[in-house]
Amino acid sequence: MLIKLLTKVFGSRNDRTLRRMRKVVDLINRMEPEVEKLTNEELRAKTDEFRERLANGAVLETLIPEAFAVVREASKRVFGMRHFDVQLLGGMVLNERCIAEMRTGEGKTLTATLPAYLNALSGRGVHVVTVNDYLAQRDAENNRPLFEFLGLSVGINLPNMPAPAKRAAYAADITYGTNNEFGFDYLRDNMAFSPEERVQRKLHYALVDEVDSILIDEARTPLIISGPAEDSSEMYIRVNKLIPKLIRQEKEDSDTFQGEGHFSVDEKSRQVHLTERGLIKIEEMLVEAGIMEEGESLYSPANIMLMHHVTAALRAHVLFTRDVDYIVKDGEVIIVDEHTGRTMQGRRWSDGLHQAVEAKEGVEIQNENQTLASITFQNYFRLYEKLAGMTGTADTEAFEFSSIYKLDTIVVPTNRPMIRKDLADLVYMTEQEKIGAIIEDIRERTANGQPVLVGTISIEKSEVVSAELTKAGIEHKVLNAKFHAMEAEIVSQAGQPGAVTIATNMAGRGTDIVLGGSWQSEIALLENPTEDQIAAIKAAWQIRHDAVLASGGLHIIGTERHESRRIDNQLRGRAGRQGDAGSSRFYLSMEDALMRIFASDRVSGMMRKLGMKPGEAIEHPWVTKAIANAQRKVESRNFDIRKQLLEYDDVASDQRRAIYSQRNELLDVADVSETINSIREDVFKTVIDSYIPTQSLEEMWDVEGLEQRLKNDFDLDMPIAQWLEDEPQLHEETLRERILQLAIADYQRKEEVVGFDMMRNFEKGVMLQTLDSLWKEHLAAMDYLRQGIHLRGYAQKDPKQEYKRESFAMFAAMLESLKYEVISVLSKVQVRMPEEVEALEVQRREEAERLAKQQQLSHESDNSALMSQEEANVAASLERKVGRNDPCPCGSGKKYKQCHGRLQ
């Protein structure tokens, strides 16, 4: 109550921020007449003037009025478009490390040119991040003329570009690309074997378009570069045959382990668990199939991988549905993004889940992979000095943006008042009744010439609606993961009079639906159109546009509520752009997933009290409130999971930063011999201490063990027992010194053979390769630790603190192993002649260049909904697969098995 009163008196933080910024907008508007007088050359010269002022110590924020006025004028001359005042506000919000919520159709792409230009003046680079390659290319090419007019360079960062082209793109003042590609380049740079192989500069300023999609929806998605692991495809096939024989428990009571069925399903957290009966049943079937020995337990340590196969197969059969979570195309399982409805070609679920789905569908099973490098989007984007983003729907996630990314959300007002009518939800008892009502609504509206956009949450649902429309004789177009090639075209024409378009979820995001259709698309189909043809097309469009407005504008139909209010708002936001007329309504049934899982008891109770008859709908504020509360519950739990994942990942992030920092220092230094010498002393001291304890009696020494260790691990033949027998005066200190000096002398002989420079290169290569190999193993060990750490809670221990403590101990052990491995490899290596080493280096360079041209990226993602502790790491992973005989992704030019795949 008190907060509401204070807000009424002083205004909200959002209002105060906008009031402050409007004063700057007024200043920019006052500058406009003067800027208009400048010639093109004088306008372009302003960029050099701004750069000079920055070099002389000016603060970037002091340039905002002039810089924005210059960009606005340049836009008028290049595009014939003038930035609205609200776009200037949006530009200032984006410069202040904030999220700008700007409604659909308000010109976010043009708004982004303002902060992009301003922050590029420092010469440190600006990354404009989009959700797909099409938008990255489109926005870069559309805005290139403006930036080049002002003397700035523009680069596009796309998958499969050769390294020199990527380096040039990053060297540009403003670089457009996708979140995936920026993240993968960061990982690849930290696998490089020379400074020249890196492509990115320091991460300065990132401007993220559709920021909610990237920083919220994909927050659980790690980017992974991986290599091949052991082939176990046969086991997936054998286990897959057993799963259909298991029976689901009918009642999901609290005691799932003691249930009557073989497995229970927790739909809220998307988990499946074997019951006691199920465990006995699966063990019997595994024994019958000859997979497990009689009397063995599935939970015994020897069968841990078998348990992994059973769990993956059970999840594949029960939780993942064809044409909802994935499609099968050309003998391949392709994931469908739950947030956009788009197919994610090349992405794969991790932890054997994808292989289990492939076995279920009877397609070829691809090998599992082992992580070489990994980072989540949460941690990647927090590496930027300055981060900002824009979207049409951010306010519902404002708390998460603030708590995780330290980004405030500012709602930017629309240029024209929003007049869309958002009608109350209609709730039916059954899915069939709901679909019937939707068809009738579409029939009535299209009869009046009103275009309709139907939003569904899955391919399966879109095909059900499509089939019913076909049966009713209503023409329509379907836009889902199966037909996404024509996405932009279908969406742009969805505003034609009487058009009916079915869109899975938020497919087509980034393309506006213009009432009356897109006249630009019609002109694009003509070869060299005349002015008369263009005028005729525009005139015909104007008639259609006016007719659609008269019919009520675009009508949005949601076939069910999404778990997140934000996704529902995105669907609604397709109508009512730039002050146009429009309307929206959601149709729900008690059989919808959200209603069934979260709101069923309360709403069905209301419906019974009201005496609902078949075909009747309930429309009541209580129902709308119950649904909103259900969505808040899901959003809250999703946020808690993302936050928990981040807390765990922050531990790995600190270690990643330390490793990558050390690695970059190694890359930038030509001579690492001092480091090698220091490490050698530490390693030999540790080895000798384990056989000859400090200040111990000679009877306690294990001389034979020490001789064997030096021979096996360092290829050093040292007759220590003979020395002690021949030289009674040889004591502990002098013995230690002799062993170390002989090891150094042996190494120096090798250096004399190959030469100083070659040995320095070799040392550097061994250190980098060993570091990468051990880091890869450490990542796998961290994953295993993470999977079981929640069990510490049963021992009254805090799992997070235990994870931090143990992961630090593992990290320290890894660094000790690094020292040991490096000295061991350098001591045992058989050196080549300088000519051979040089020839190998030339070959490596040539292969690295060839690799850059042929690199193929594939990504891995898990769009499974919610996960509990032990399942957290099964979260989505974007993965790049590398075969044993493929070129190593680090860019060394060697085969993977001879480079990062060697020291395993």
Curated annotation (Swiss-Prot):
Record-level GO cellular component terms: cell envelope Sec protein transport complex; cytosol; plasma membrane
Chief location bin: membrane
Residue sites binding Zn(2+) per the record: 888, 890, 899-900
Membrane topology designation: Peripheral membrane protein
Annotated residues for binding of ATP: 87, 105-109, 512
Subcellular location: Cell inner membrane; Cytoplasm
Catalytic activity field: ATP + H2O + cellular proteinSide 1 = ADP + phosphate + cellular proteinSide 2
Extent of Polar residues compositional bias: 853-871
Biological process annotations from GO: intracellular protein transmembrane transport; protein import; protein targeting; protein transport by the Sec complex
GO molecular function, one term: metal ion binding
Top class in the EC scheme: translocase
Cofactor(s) needed for function: Zn(2+)
Cofactor binding note from Swiss-Prot or TrEMBL: May bind 1 zinc ion per subunit.
Keywords noted in UniProt: ATP-binding, Cell inner membrane, Cell membrane, Cytoplasm, Membrane, Metal-binding, Nucleotide-binding, Protein transport, Translocase, Translocation, Transport, Zinc
Pfam assignment, any one: SecA_DEAD
Keyword Metal-binding: yes
Residue ranges, annotated region (Disordered): 851-904
Top-rank taxon: Bacteria
Subunit details: Monomer and homodimer. Part of the essential Sec protein translocation apparatus which comprises SecA, SecYEG and auxiliary proteins SecDF-YajC and YidC.
HAMAP family: SecA
Family the UniProt entry places it in: Belongs to the SecA family.
Role: Part of the Sec protein translocase complex. Interacts with the SecYEG preprotein conducting channel. Has a central role in coupling the hydrolysis of ATP to the transfer of proteins into and across the cell membrane, serving both as a receptor for the preprotein-SecB complex and as an ATP-driven molecular motor driving the stepwise translocation of polypeptide chains across the membrane.
Descriptive protein name: Protein translocase subunit SecA
